[in-house]
């Protein structure tokens, strides 16, 4: 590792951080050697109605799979996010909201948010919602989305948030699986200057003949646009709130009572409902938010994720509110109407902590540094990355242009299934390397195993597994515990299989190499697609790249690259050859792409995740049955890629 590629903890951060490197090592060691003692102490960071005496009862045996934390304690998640802050922080801002139009802004204190949540919790009860019922939420990025979630938690209902861009079929599948009687939506959302017909999508979902459970649809009036209305079923949010009481006693929930369902996106077949429970999740979301972002009282924290994803749940709602944070919520996208929007919002709201995704960083990179010429960024202290491995070139650009080389970057690795961050730098403790998620959080025991399940010691590469449970871990796949065991615990017995590959370097740092199915076997040698993608994107003319394997007569698999060039650059055969040589130089001859297809856009979900299964099929010339593309932000991208594919057979 060259000295230039190691970014030391800034001295001012180290002096004032929650933990330094020595403290991290001591706490981590304790959390592994004595997990019960460690979590017995740190479980106290949230408020309990009946304090726990039992800490951990877990088994990763796929025949006897069970995960229980703090399991004789009782609590309420909503009370932990609101009530416990009222005495000291009632007047503190809980939410700063900025609309798609920057001129539209709202602010809510903790006392005001508490009132809204209590009233809506009573409104839900008036519509027949009881403890244990699953309520489907399909909302835009407005404060009422968080209000709806916290109101469900307050009365012991289980929320199932569906991202506000999913298709009616996707909504229907989730409603059917959860048997939701009550749905919560808005007339329309606004995103990137466009109106999103949320209520229309809900109406279409309910018209599915298999949806027979829905009794009520609560509609928040966001735009006032024309919508269809079903008398007796549809009810306005504001009408319910006008008559709802401001007092709602929080329900006493067992630590292992369900808090929410969140369905994993992009899976084939039936949706997979990831079930998270109350106690362990709240402890873990709260603790990781404070330690990973080194959160200090009175700081403004901005997570750009949508509430429909796990990042929005853990690091826009439950973690920050449990810590009495001031949370910036943005309705739109941070590069609309211009790429300067991100910087403008950081300056306008004096944001101290920013948590965003590599896909946005690369999009901003492609627009050029000049978009940030008037950006000050002097309030910013910590920056985070989430959603996929960040390539080193994007990491450095983020560090230089957004962070002015002063802000540590926490490159966080975790999953919907993990509930919270598992591997990440801590700002005051961890020297960072661009592209590495670095070291595990407290209580997390990662390991690498080969394809036979044998542990890889020291430096090496393999399948990333976790050897023991942590409090934020999912408990089951809703309604299908066998599927939970099969998906995560049968591949490598007695271990949680993440589905990702990773390598560990000489410093014990972890580098996520991508999904295991994103590994290409070229002439018997394994290559992580993320590595080839990073090499391509490090070229100054490349904005984005996605790499997949395809059948090759000689090598077994060849390397097929989809490349998006920076704005204004024309694709040429000369540039294609230059990029092949560039990768050869960066990684080695083995990694040289066999085929490079120019791509004006890549197939992405609305959260920015590249859907590689489409790219693999197109590269393999299997274009007649690509499967459901309804979750893509722009399904038309697929047709363009098919038309210009390079592996056609006549």
Swiss-Prot record:
It comes from Shewanella frigidimarina (strain NCIMB 400). GO terms for cellular component: cytosol. Acetylated. Deacetylation by the SIR2-homolog deacetylase activates the enzyme. GO terms for biological process: acetyl-CoA biosynthetic process from acetate. ATP binds at residues 387-389, 411-416, 500, 515, 526. The modification N6-acetyllysine is found at residue 609. Mg(2+) binds at residues 537, 539, 542. This is Acetyl-coenzyme A synthetase. Signal peptide: none annotated. Its EC number is 6.2.1.1.
């Amino acid at each position: 590792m060259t000295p230039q590629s190691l970014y030391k903890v800034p001295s001012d951060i180290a002096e004032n951080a929650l933990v330094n490197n020595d403290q991290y090592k001591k706490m981590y060691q304790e959390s592994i050697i004595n997990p019960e003692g460690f979590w017995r102490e740190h479980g106290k960071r949230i408020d309990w109605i009946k304090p726990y005496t039992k800490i951990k009862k877990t088994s990763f045996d796929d025949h006897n799979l069970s995960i229980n934390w703090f399991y004789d304690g009782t609590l309420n998640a909503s009370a932990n996010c609101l009530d416990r802050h009222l005495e000291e922080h009632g007047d503190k801002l809980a939410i700063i909201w900025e609309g798609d139009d920057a001129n539209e802004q709202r602010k809510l204190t903790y006392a005001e948010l508490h009132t809204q949540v209590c009233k809506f919790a009573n409104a839900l009860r008036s519509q027949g919602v009881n403890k244990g019922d699953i309520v489907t939420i399909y909302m835009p990025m407005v404060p009422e989305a968080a209000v709806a979630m916290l109101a469900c938690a307050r009365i012991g209902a289980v929320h199932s948030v569906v991202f506000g861009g999913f298709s009616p079929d996707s909504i229907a599948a989730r409603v059917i699986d959860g048997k939701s009687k009550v749905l919560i939506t808005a007339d329309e959302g606004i995103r990137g200057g466009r109106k999103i017909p949320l209520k229309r999508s809900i109406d279409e979902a309910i018209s599915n003949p298999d949806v027979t459970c829905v009794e009520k649809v609560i509609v928040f009036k966001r735009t006032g646009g024309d919508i269809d209305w079903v008398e007796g079923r549809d009810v306005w949010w504001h009408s319910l709130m006008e008559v709802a009481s401001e007092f709602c006693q929080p329900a006493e929930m067992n630590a292992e009572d369900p808090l929410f369902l969140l369905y994993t996106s992009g899976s084939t077949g039936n949706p997979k409902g990831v079930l998270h429970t109350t106690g362990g999740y709240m402890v873990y979301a709260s603790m990781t938010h404070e330690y990973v972002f080194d959160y200090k009282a009175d700081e403004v924290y901005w997570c750009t994720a949508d509430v429909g994803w796990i990042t929005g749940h853990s690091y826009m709602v439950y973690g920050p509110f449990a810590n009495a944070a001031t949370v910036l919520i943005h309705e739109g996208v941070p590069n609309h109407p211009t790429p300067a929007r991100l910087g403008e919002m950081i300056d306008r709201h004096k944001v101290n902590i920013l948590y965003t995704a590599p896909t946005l960083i690369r999009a901003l990179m492609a627009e050029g540094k000049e978009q940030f010429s008037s950006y000050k960024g002097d309030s910013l202290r910590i920056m985070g990355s989430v959603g996929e491995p960040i390539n080193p070139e994007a990491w450095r650009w983020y560090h230089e242009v957004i962070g002015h080389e002063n802000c540590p970057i926490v490159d966080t690795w975790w999953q919907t299934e993990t509930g919270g961050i598992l591997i990440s730098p801590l700002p005051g403790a961890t020297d960072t390397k661009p592209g590495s998620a670095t070291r595990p959080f407290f209580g997390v025991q990662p390991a690498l195993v080969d394809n036979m399940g044998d542990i890889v010691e020291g430096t090496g590469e393999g399948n990333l597994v976790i050897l023991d449970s942590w409090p934020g871990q999912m408990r089951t796949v809703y309604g299908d515990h066998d599927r939970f065991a099969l998906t995560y615990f049968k591949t490598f017995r007695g271990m949680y299989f993440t589905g990702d590959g990773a390598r560990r370097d000489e410093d014990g740092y972890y580098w996520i190499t991508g999904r295991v199915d994103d590994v290409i076997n070229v002439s018997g040698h394994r290559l992580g697609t993320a590595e080839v993608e990073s090499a391509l994107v490090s070229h100054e003319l490349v904005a984005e790249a996605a790499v997949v394997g395809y059948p090759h007569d000689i090598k077994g698999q060849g390397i097929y690259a989809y490349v998006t060039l920076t704005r204004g650059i024309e694709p040429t055969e000369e540039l294609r050859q230059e990029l092949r040589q560039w990768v050869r130089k960066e990684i080695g001859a083995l990694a040289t792409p066999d085929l490079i297809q120019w791509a004006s856009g890549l197939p992405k979900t609305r959260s920015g995740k590249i859907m590689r299964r489409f790219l693999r099929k197109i590269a393999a010339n299997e274009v007649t049955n690509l499967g459901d593309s309804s979750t893509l932000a722009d399904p038309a991208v697929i047709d363009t890629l098919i038309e210009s594919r390079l592996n056609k057979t006549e």
